[in-house]
Amino acid sequence: MQDIRRDKFSGRIMGIDFGSKRIGISISDPTLTIAQGLFVLENNSKVFEEIKEICSQYNVGLIVIGLPVKLSGKHSNKTNEVVKFINELKSKLKIEVISWDERLTTKLAQKSKIEMNLKKKKRQDKNLNDVIASSLILQSYLDYLKNKETMVARNED
């Protein structure tokens, strides 16, 4: 997983949960405190252009993409597919793109749908799962940034 200093980018952060069919998209608030799920994009030939438009619309300065790793920390079969997508995204956009550990986000997304008391039909909505997963990935990164800033501030005192 990569890290990037807050002073290396400006604007909001976009979260992406990559899938071979669907891509969940989330966005941070302007203060980089809260992740909000937006929607799902179809993973097709237009996806890079659509991501570029969303970045422009929301003033995105950094993209965080969930990197699938096993609980042991080893790469999964899907990891290479995500890395290829990250490299292609970097080549098409002039925005910093980093990977972030997405372990258990799909399970947490499913659990959160149950906790929201959604009806069974709505809980089975795969698009909702992808949006929630992208929000969880992004929120994890935002929390990391906040904790890192707190630690730096304490060390400066």
Predicted regions and their residues:
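Phosphate- and other anionic-substrate recognition elements at nucleic-acid/protein interfaces
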Residues: 1-14, 20-21, 26-157
